[in-house]
A protein has these predicted regions:
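Active-site-proximal cap/loop segments of hydrolase catalytic domains
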Residues: 1-114
Length: 114
């Protein structure tokens, strides 16, 4: 999934140049930045249980965005979980973490889709 609050990604992820080229800076093009941060800024409309599985060192979709979304959903009493995999990036390389991800997916599906 993409970053839910792109404002938190500015300067924290690897895409700063692309952001500036495509949508400008947050201070020069605030309206657009708020629009693309829609999921976080409209968290009060989310009712779907949510599972965040994130690498601690993910520079593609930084941890901060998942932490913010998780906290917002917890505050709103939406069922949500945040699992952070230490030392991992966007793609996990530790076999036990990959196994854990699959087990968590299956448990989540069993709980919320059955």
């Amino acid at each position: 999934a993409g970053i839910a609050n792109i404002l938190s990604g500015f300067g924290d992820d690897q895409y700063i140049r692309e952001y500036i080229v495509e949508i400008g800076t947050p201070w020069d093009n605030t309206e657009t930045w708020l629009k693309v941060s829609h999921p976080f800024l409209n968290a009060n409309n989310i009712v779907t249980p949510t599972l965040f599985l994130v690498g601690e060192k993910d520079y593609n979709v930084p941890l901060i965005g998942s932490e913010q979304m998780y906290q917002a959903l917890k505050y709103l009493n939406i069922p949500t979980e945040l699992i952070v995999y230490p030392g991992e990036h966007h793609s996990f390389s530790t076999p036990s973490y990959n196994k854990d991800v699959l087990e968590r997916y299956l448990a989540w599906y069993e709980k919320y889709l059955n």
